[in-house]
Amino acid sequence: MLLLFCICCVFIKLVLAEVNLTFVDYAKLPPNYAELLANLIDQHGLMLFDTADVRIEAYNYLLNSITETNTDTDAYLCQLLTGQYTTDCYIFGDSVYEGPENINPSTRYID
């Protein structure tokens, strides 16, 4: 019984490690972005809010914090949310953005 409990604990730890966002390199993020990410995760690296809400909040934060939106903005957002500094980051899934009249936060990606 104890062995089964230990195996379950190890399994849970491995599963939790998969959703841990602490792999983001804070040193490469501007201080405000790192602070935003730190506020959205708990001490175990688990997201405190619904993923779509976090992504929308992070995107709005970046748009309000940067005077000129460009590919660097998208790359910073991608790094903030995924740890990857790239502009090829489908943050809202793999659906194609159909324009502002058809916004669905669960499927929209950052252009």
From Swiss-Prot:
InterPro entries: UPF0321. Residues 1-17 form the signal peptide. Glycans are attached at N20. Pfam families: DUF2430. Keywords: Glycoprotein, Signal. It comes from the Eukaryota. Belongs to the UPF0321 family. This is UPF0321 protein P20C8.02c. The lineage of its organism: Eukaryota, Fungi, Dikarya, Ascomycota, Taphrinomycotina.
